[in-house]
Every structure is written in C-alpha cells, then in structure tokens.
C-alpha cells in the first residue's frame, strides 16, 4: 500500500544533510527546513518557488523533482547556510 512518509523535523533533517548532502529529501521537508532557517516565501512562478532571507543577497529558488527536492538545490541551500552563517530558529 501507499505508506505515508512522516515529516522529518527541520533540526533532524539539517543534521542528516550536514552528514550527507546527497541524500534524498522530501520536498515538503526541504521547504520546512528553508522556513526554519528564516527564509520567507517571496513568489511562485510555475513550479519555481522563490525564498528570501534577510542575511542573503540572493534568492533561493526551489522546485520539486517529483516528491523530492532537487539535489543541487539542497546543496545550494547548504552553501548559503555556510556562507551567510544561517542557523535554525528553534
């Protein structure tokens, strides 16, 4: 049958991604992490969703690949976290 995947808490997902940025991430979990890091949704164009962060000069643009987040977009987020010193708002 269809198993309903449970949401991963942003803090847990963040830890998992720091360990291995190549893992598959459900798009909704990825979005939850983005918001938990302090990003706000600025606009949607087709399947592309743009997020802005007060500390980041550039937009983070994401779109799902099926139900998952695209790997390069996950990596882009991790780069931004490192570059701008973003932290989870727990």
What is each model feature region?
Residues 7-11, 15-32, 36, 42:
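A charge-rich, low-complexity, intrinsically flexible signal that marks solvent-exposed coils, linkers
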Residues 12-18, 61, 82-85:
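Basic helix-extension-helix modules of the SAP/HeH family
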Residues 24, 45, 67-71:
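Short, well-ordered coil↔helix boundary/capping segments
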Residues 32, 49, 75-79:
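N-terminal, well-ordered alpha-helical segments
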Residues 36-62:
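A short, structured beta-strand/loop element
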Residues 65-90:
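C-terminal structural segments of small proteins and small subunits
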């Amino acid at each position: 049958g269809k198993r309903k995947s449970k949401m991963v808490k942003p803090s847990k997902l963040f830890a998992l991604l720091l360990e291995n940025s190549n893992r598959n991430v459900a798009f909704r979990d990825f979005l939850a992490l983005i918001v938990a890091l302090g990003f706000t949704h600025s606009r949607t164009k087709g399947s592309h969703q743009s997020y802005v962060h007060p500390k980041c000069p550039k937009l983070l643009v994401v779109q799902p690949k099926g139900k998952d987040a695209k790997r390069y977009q996950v990596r882009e987020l991790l780069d931004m976290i490192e570059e701008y010193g973003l932290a989870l708002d727990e």
